[in-house]
Amino acid sequence: MNFQNIFIFVALILAVFAGQSQAGWLKKIGKKIERVGQHTRDATIQGLGIAQQAANVAATARG
């Protein structure tokens, strides 16, 4: 009976440490995905600005 309690305690400690290491791995992937999203957002904003400038030039050229 005492061995069972010790086994459960050790298994619980291992589960806690394994959960923390998994969180670190998932956190790294999440940060990479977030960075890709930020770059996509910035590129879209920059592209819209260039498109607006081109539209203004075209409108000015037409008169």
Swiss-Prot record:
Protein's UniProt name: Sarcotoxin-1A
Principal subcellular localisation of the protein: secreted
Signal sequence interval, chain numbering: 1-23
GO biological process: antibacterial humoral response; defense response to Gram-negative bacterium; defense response to Gram-positive bacterium; innate immune response
Purpose: Sarcotoxins, which are potent bactericidal proteins, are produced in response to injury. They are cytotoxic to both Gram-positive and Gram-negative bacteria.
InterPro entries referenced in this protein's UniProt entry, alphabetically: Cecropin, Cecropin_insect
Family listed: Belongs to the cecropin family.
Keyword Transmembrane helix in annotation: no
GO cellular component, one term: extracellular space
Domain of life according to the entry: Eukaryota
Keywords: Amidation, Antibiotic, Antimicrobial, Immunity, Innate immunity, Secreted, Signal
Pfam families with a match to the protein in the record: Cecropin
Modified residues annotated as Arginine amide in this record: R62
UniProt subcellular location: Secreted
Keyword Repeat: no
